[in-house]
């Protein structure tokens, strides 16, 4: 496995792969890798000749400096996991390598609408940071496919739109959420939970599933469903942050024409902001 930290060396390797006619898959990450990331890697390996994993804690997508400062940096352990998975290339640049003149004056990519609604409304600038770094990685790696987790549902929708709008010739693959046996969605942020909070955490998925059951049973008073779900989360020990039921294809409000809904839940548990989602077919 090759570990590359600079743009010139990355370009050199990508040129070589292109000359050899290899099909390249990219898995963009911020490191602190868990089994959910490994599922992305496995999907990439199944679809391409060469797998490139990027590890970069992107300062542009953090709306709170304290979150950026405490985000775990575990490069050595991450590389050991990726080596066992037989990943071909790891791109692990420094912030200086990606943003040589800082982030304030760096050119950015913004996806109107999707970047400022829902999760974007509570985290100003977050999705602009995501679309900027992902577009830069697409330009650098020139992948045929790129794999993203469906846990970050809005992020996946945003990237799909950016790819369509910008004309990137890249297949975007959404990989289903990987869960612990108790239902908790795997996330790097789970590492912020205490042992006691970890016991409470699966309650998020239980509330999510309860909302899904109500929708599948034909209930359509969304305001009431959301209000009850918020109460349930708070009673379980969470601080409900945002609960949305949206059209899964547009992320707009559910209408009589909506065929699928997505339930998006965000809640605080101690210092960890946990997110999860679930799709529901609407009869």
From Swiss-Prot:
Q: Which GO terms of the cellular component aspect does the record hold?
A: cytosol
The annotated active site, in chain numbering, is: 37
Q: Which Gene3D superfamilies match?
A: HUPs, Pantoate-beta-alanine ligase, C-terminal domain
Q: Which GO terms describe its biological process?
A: pantothenate biosynthetic process
Keywords, alphabetical = ATP-binding, Cytoplasm, Ligase, Nucleotide-binding, Pantothenate biosynthesis
Q: Which domain of life is it from?
A: Bacteria
- Does the UniProt entry include the keyword Cell membrane? no
**Principal location class:** cytoplasm
Reaction(s) catalysed by this chain, per the record, are: (R)-pantoate + beta-alanine + ATP = (R)-pantothenate + AMP + diphosphate + H(+)
**Family listed:** Belongs to the pantothenate synthetase family.
Q: What does this protein do?
A: Catalyzes the condensation of pantoate with beta-alanine in an ATP-dependent reaction via a pantoyl-adenylate intermediate.
Assembly notes: Homodimer.
According to UniProt, the name of this protein is Pantothenate synthetase
Q: Which organism is it from?
A: Escherichia coli O6:H1 (strain CFT073 / ATCC 700928 / UPEC)
Gene encoding the protein:
panC
């Amino acid at each position: 496995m090759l570990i590359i930290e600079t743009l010139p060396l990355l370009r050199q390797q990508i040129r070589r792969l292109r000359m050899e006619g290899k099909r390249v898959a990219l898995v963009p990450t911020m490191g602190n890798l868990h089994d959910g990331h490994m599922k992305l890697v496995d999907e990439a390996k199944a679809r391409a000749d060469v797998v490139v994993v990027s590890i970069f804690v992107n300062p542009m997508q953090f709306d709170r400096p304290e979150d950026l400062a405490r985000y775990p940096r575990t490069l050595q352990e991450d590389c050991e996991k990726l080596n066992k998975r037989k990943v071909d290339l790891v791109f692990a640049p420094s912030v200086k390598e990606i943003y040589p003149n800082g982030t304030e004056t760096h050119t950015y990519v913004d996806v109107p609408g999707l970047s400022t609604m829902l999760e974007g409304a509570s985290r100003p600038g977050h999705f602009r940071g995501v679309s900027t770094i992902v577009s830069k990685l697409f330009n650098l790696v020139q992948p045929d496919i790129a794999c993203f987790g469906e846990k970050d549902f809005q992020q996946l929708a945003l990237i799909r739109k950016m790819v369509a709008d910008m004309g990137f010739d890249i297949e975007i693959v959404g990989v289903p959420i990987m869960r612990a046996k108790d239902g908790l969605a795997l996330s790097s942020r789970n590492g912020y939970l205490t042992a006691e909070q970890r016991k409470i955490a699966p309650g998020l998925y239980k509330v999510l599933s309860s909302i899904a059951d109500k929708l599948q049973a034909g209930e359509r008073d969304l305001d009431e469903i959301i209000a009850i779900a918020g109460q349930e989360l708070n009673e379980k020990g969470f601080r409900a942050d945002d609960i949305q039921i949206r059209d899964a294809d547009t992320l707009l409000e559910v209408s009589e024409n909506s065929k699928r809904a997505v339930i998006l839940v965000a809640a605080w548990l101690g210092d960890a902001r946990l997110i999860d989602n679930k799709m529901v077919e609407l009869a």
